[in-house]
Amino acid sequence: MAEITAAMVKELRESTGAGMMDCKNALSETNGDFDKAVQLLREKGLGKAAKKADRLAAEGLVSVKVSDDFTSATVSEINSETDFVAKNDQFIALTKDTTAHIQSNSLQSVEELHSSTINGVKFEEYLKSQIATIGENLVVRRFATLKAGANGVVNGYIHTNGRVGVVIAAACDSTEVASKSRDLLRQICMHIAAMRPSYLSYEDLDMTFVENEYKALVAELEKENEERRRLKDPNKPEHKIPQFASRKQLSDAILKEAEEKIKEELKAQGKPEKIWDNIIPGKMNSFIADNSQLDSKLTLMGQFYVLDDKKTVEQVIAEKEKEFGGKIKIVEFICFEVGEGLEKKTEDFAAEVAAQL
């Protein structure tokens, strides 16, 4: 058997673009015959797949798998090079099979996935064979799984175009409430897919971030007010400049002060004290809404619900708690969008041809 040197492996790798170990194995199987090794790699699709690996895969699909008992929800993103392949039935099946494999084997990382076994072969080899068949570079970019704790429940949603997927987990105070909450969680996932909140609640916001955003908000509103004053349109009154941007800033002392101010106004208006309890909650809600505009933009709980824009997600959950007879606390959500954070590689036809010559 011919000796397989590092120089031979390097030459084959540069010629075919295949991986180092694939080149070494091909040379071993062909007794060092370079041309036969090239042909073997082509027959296996390994050279073709590896050669494509420098092409950015920024299209693709997001897939969601929710276990039958609603205790585990997995979301994954697998990228392709073109939107055309993302609509390919074989690629769609690949994304579903991979997501189910991730969930059933409790995999935690892409590295762990590649070293796992699927259908009797290493996943890395399985993916290479799919690349060779489909004809484009495919990349498992990321995945995540949420688990339900005791009396917990999970659910998920995949948007019809397959480009946005969401999974969510909630903690409840009984299995009965958890079971009743399944549909609610799916609907909240739909809301997340549409509104893309960045945070779960105002409690997750950093105070320095909030303070900086407040300055930006005031500057934006003042600029709009300046334009409205110029136009003098009676249908577009000036914005009221809020004192705060988030409930993160509304301490107990601030809320108490606001309530006392409302009482003073009611007294000045001559409203009898016996009806104050009916008026104050609504005015306090208005005060909080006016001073938490950042929450309504960035946080799930503070956003107005897409299925009922008169209520926030937090208010909808509170109503369901009364209906179901128990507590429902959203613990975590994860939203993936295809290509999020990736920069698509664009070339004109002439440049693409030149790059291949």
Curated annotation (Swiss-Prot):
Transmembrane spans: none
InterPro entries: EF-Ts_dimer_sf, Transl_elong_EFTs/EF1B, Transl_elong_EFTs/EF1B_dimer, Transl_elong_Ts_CS, UBA-like_sf
Keywords: Cytoplasm, Elongation factor, Protein biosynthesis
Span list, region Involved in Mg(2+) ion dislocation from EF-Tu: 82-85
Listed CDD domains: UBA_EF-Ts
GO molecular function, one term: translation elongation factor activity
Keyword Protein biosynthesis included in the entry's annotation: yes
PROSITE patterns, sorted: EF_TS_1 (PS01126), EF_TS_2 (PS01127)
Pfam families: EF_TS
Paired cysteines (S-S): none
Any GO CC annotation of this UniProt entry: cytoplasm
Cellular compartments annotated: Cytoplasm
Gene3D superfamilies referenced in this protein's UniProt entry, alphabetically: 1.10.286.20, DNA helicase RuvA subunit, C-terminal domain, Elongation factor Ts, dimerisation domain
Described purpose of this protein according to its UniProt entry: Associates with the EF-Tu.GDP complex and induces the exchange of GDP to GTP. It remains bound to the aminoacyl-tRNA.EF-Tu.GTP complex up to the GTP hydrolysis stage on the ribosome.
Listed NCBIfam families: tsf
Listed PANTHER family: ELONGATION FACTOR TS, ELONGATION FACTOR TS, MITOCHONDRIAL
UniProt record similarity statement: Belongs to the EF-Ts family.
Name of the protein in its database record: Elongation factor Ts
Organism from which the protein derives: Campylobacter jejuni (strain RM1221)
Gene: tsf
